[in-house]
Amino acid sequence: MKKWVVKIGTSILRGNEDQSTEQVIESLCKSLTSFIFKGNKVILVTSGAVGLGCKKLNLNTRPKELSALQAVAAVGQVNLMTLYEKTMKKLGHNIAQILITKTDFDSRESFNNASKTFQKLIDLNVIPIVNENDSIANEELKYGDNDTLSALVALAINANKLILLTDIENLYSKDPRNNEDAHPIKEVNSNQLKIIKDKNIQNYNNEWGTGGITTKLIAAEIATKGGVEVQLADGRNENNLINIFNEKKIGTIFHPVDKPVGNKKSWLSHAIKTVGQITLDEGACLAIEQKGASLLVVGVKEVEGDFTVNQAVRIVNTNKKEVAKGITSMSSDSLKRILNKKENINSSMIVVHRDVLALT
């Protein structure tokens, strides 16, 4: 049995002159059904609420004001789920709507609860349809794109693959719209992905969506570090999803790392909410990055913010570049007293244990 996550973007769902939104959803649902009938499980992460809301309200441009975006999303989400429910019912499937904000994943307990809900739904042969809760999320609580959200969902259910359906055929070396010498990149390993993402070689932003290729590279990094293969493909071609379900090498495939960090550390790296920051000296950075060591108090140079035991912090080097995140065994007050020489230093005291420390 395969357990896959499929993410479809706004640019596909809005349709075009040749294919309406209703036809796009019908084709998508038929493809998902064919995969499920073979004994597989699937979760759909869908964008489109704002785009469909604009269409319903006859708005020619995407609103910029947050309250207007939230209102339009509320209108569009109803339309979006009605289309999915109507289509899937004809095909003999039940669906469930799951709307998520960052707070639903920022603690281990809530992440586990979400994982259990997803698993129970697919065990009941229900297709979970996930979207960010754009109608209530403010800027602080938003992922801002469903690419990142889809990667976290893939981690939550220990998926085998994440499929990102978008409006480009492949990852390219350059933006093909502006560079005739751009060439497609068919396969990407973990080392190549880091280089490509860090260089940020391209960014196909569009009017209706909030993503672009950069967010897809970030999603690919999150998923592949957790052991999930990612395949990016052109969702405008209705045959592509069926071909991917049949293991065809279409678009760009991002291969998972050789040694996945696992569900828990992936969550630590990408979903947890941090409340403080710890700066390390060079020796401590090398110890946690190269030796997988716990963070000891002797390696701490500076403490910022207020946090208690069992809260999450960013861990940075002396240049303030983030190297890890972790859950502390000591409060900020205790650490500051030690740094200010008001308490004796026991160099073996653990600040963040390696079991709850994840490199970023």
UniProtKB/Swiss-Prot annotation:
Binding-site residues for ATP, renumbered to this chain: 7, 166-167, 210-216
GO molecular function, one term: RNA binding
Gene3D superfamilies tied to this protein: Acetylglutamate kinase-like (3.40.1160.10), PUA domain (2.30.130.10)
EC code: 2.7.2.11
Pathway connected to this protein: Amino-acid biosynthesis; L-proline biosynthesis; L-glutamate 5-semialdehyde from L-glutamate: step 1/2
Gene Ontology CC: cytosol
InterPro entries, alphabetized: AceGlu_kinase-like_sf, Asp/Glu/Uridylate_kinase, G5K_ProB, Glu/AcGlu_kinase, Glu_5kinase, Glu_5kinase/COase_Synthase, Glutamate_5-kinase_CS, PUA
Subcellular location: Cytoplasm
Coiled-coil regions listed in the entry: none
UniProt key word Amino-acid biosynthesis: yes
Catalytic activity: L-glutamate + ATP = L-glutamyl 5-phosphate + ADP
Statement: the UniProt record of this protein carries the keyword Coiled coil: no
Domain called PUA: residue spans: 275-348
Residues where substrate binds: 47, 134, 146
UniProt keyword annotations, A-Z: Amino-acid biosynthesis, ATP-binding, Cytoplasm, Kinase, Nucleotide-binding, Proline biosynthesis, Transferase
GO biological process: L-proline biosynthetic process
One Pfam family, short name: AA_kinase
Role noted for this protein: Catalyzes the transfer of a phosphate group to glutamate to form L-glutamate 5-phosphate.
Family: Belongs to the glutamate 5-kinase family.
Protein name in the entry: Glutamate 5-kinase
Organism: Prochlorococcus marinus subsp. pastoris (strain CCMP1986 / NIES-2087 / MED4)
Taxonomy of the source species: Bacteria, Bacillati, Cyanobacteriota, Cyanophyceae, Synechococcales
Originating gene: proB
